[in-house]
Amino acid sequence: MSLLTEVETPIRNEWGCRCNDSSDPLVVAASIIGILHLILWILDRLFFKCIYRLFKHGLKRGPSTEGVPESMREEYREEQQNAVDADDGHFVSIELE
């Protein structure tokens, strides 16, 4: 029998749960890991667009702008922002007439 499973047994015409090893450190650790995994999965599904956009565009460091005129820096920022905005439109809407 696995330490991580609960066994249902008939007790006096009722269904009960017999969990003898619930204080075992391995069971406690597995429960904590399972709960953390569930929380992270839910957060990932709720905020996946923000998270992956941050990883895709936010963590990339652009080239150094040392010695570059401000007008060229602004032009580069606009190009980068347009690239990010273009990525938002990956859904295609089709209108039927």
Curated annotation (Swiss-Prot):
Summary of activators and inhibitors of this protein? The M2 protein from most influenza A strains is inhibited by amantadine and rimantadine, resulting in viral uncoating incapacity. Emergence of amantadine-resistant variants is usually rapid.
List, alphabetically, the GO terms of the cellular component aspect: host cell plasma membrane; membrane; virion membrane
List the subcellular locations.
Answer: Virion membrane; Host apical cell membrane
Q: Which residue spans belong to the Intravirion compartment?
A: 44-97
- Give site residues, Seems to be involved in pH gating: 41
**Residues at the site labelled Essential for channel activity, possibly by being protonated during channel activation, and by forming the channel gate and the selective filter:** 37
Q: Which stretches are Virion surface in the membrane topology?
A: 1-22
Q: Which GO terms describe its molecular function?
A: monoatomic ion channel activity; proton transmembrane transporter activity
> Residues bearing covalent lipid (S-palmitoyl cysteine)?
50
Q: Which UniProt keywords apply?
A: Disulfide bond, Glycoprotein, Host cell membrane, Host membrane, Host-virus interaction, Hydrogen ion transport, Inhibition of host autophagy by virus, Ion channel, Ion transport, Lipoprotein, Membrane, Palmitate, Phosphoprotein, Signal-anchor, Transmembrane, Transmembrane helix, Transport, Viral ion channel, Virion
Q: How does it sit in the membrane?
A: Single-pass type III membrane protein
Biological process terms from the Gene Ontology for this record are:
protein complex oligomerization; symbiont genome entry into host cell via pore formation in plasma membrane; symbiont-mediated suppression of host autophagy
Q: Which residues cross the membrane?
A: 23-43
Q: Which InterPro entries match?
A: Flu_M2 (IPR002089)
Q: Which residues carry this modification: Phosphoserine?
A: 64, 93
Q: Let me see what the UniProt entry remarks about domains.
A: Cytoplasmic tail plays an important role in virion assembly and morphogenesis.
The UniProt family comment states: Belongs to the influenza viruses matrix protein M2 family.
This protein's assembly is summarised as: Homotetramer; composed of two disulfide-linked dimers held together by non-covalent interactions. May interact with matrix protein 1.
Function, as annotated, reads: Forms a proton-selective ion channel that is necessary for the efficient release of the viral genome during virus entry. After attaching to the cell surface, the virion enters the cell by endocytosis. Acidification of the endosome triggers M2 ion channel activity.
Name by which UniProt lists this protein: Matrix protein 2
